[in-house]
Amino acid sequence: MSNPMSEGIVVERQVSAARLNELGVHGWPTWKDGVGARRLEYDAVEKSYLLDGAATLTMSDGQTIDIEKGDLVIIPAGSCHWTVHRNVRRHYRSYALSPACCII
């Protein structure tokens, strides 16, 4: 198990349907974005599940990770630069900053 507040971005690749149901992902809001680059500010830790697309995420500390359809991503609070390579559609959920909320 990982704690993204101490390790940065955490990715669980190709998440199973059982895992998605366990987390209640399909009840989370949906966010869509087209190809391009933008910087997002996160006030709290966010979990995202990519329904479609591909992107590269870069945190302000320089950590970079590629994500794609089927990945569950935990993004720590702070500045994150999104470079979207293929249109992204994702479910997301923000959490208060407490270690227990964010363990994958």
Residue spans for each PLM region:
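Short, surface-exposed secondary-structure edge patches
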Residues: 39, 47, 63-65
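Well-ordered beta-strand positions
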Residues: 49, 66, 74, 83-84
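Short acidic-glycine-tyrosine-enriched beta hairpin
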Residues: 61-78
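Conserved short histidine dyad/triad with adjacent acidic residue
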Residues: 14-16, 24-43, 76-77
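N-terminal non-globular leader segments, chiefly Sec-dependent signal peptides
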Residues: 1-23
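Ligand-binding loop in jelly-roll beta-barrel domains
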Residues: 77-102
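Short, conserved beta-strand element in jelly-roll/cupin
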Residues: 42-57
